[in-house]
């Protein structure tokens, strides 16, 4: 399945496809 967003993005960057940084956690686009 799809990888859920939820990584931290203290650098302002999300590496999970389809996710964007909603500091400090990546959220779905």
From Swiss-Prot:
In the record, biological process GO terms are: defense response; killing of cells of another organism
Modification after translation (UniProt): This is a cyclic peptide.
The protein's UniProt keywords, in alphabetical order, are:
Cytolysis, Disulfide bond, Hemolysis, Knottin, Plant defense
Q: Where is this cross-link: Cyclopeptide (Gly-Asn)?
A: 1-29
The set of disulfide-linked cysteines is 5-19, 9-21, 14-26
Q: Does the keyword Disulfide bond apply?
A: yes
Which top-level group of life is the source organism from?
A: Eukaryota
Query: Which family does the similarity line name?
Result: Belongs to the cyclotide family. Moebius subfamily.
- Domain observations: The presence of a 'disulfide through disulfide knot' structurally defines this protein as a knottin.
General function of this protein: Probably participates in a plant defense mechanism. Has hemolytic activity.
Q: What's the protein name?
A: Cycloviolacin-O15
């Amino acid at each position: 399945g799809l990888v859920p967003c939820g990584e931290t993005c203290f650098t302002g960057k999300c590496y999970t496809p389809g996710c964007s940084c909603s500091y400090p956690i990546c959220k779905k686009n």
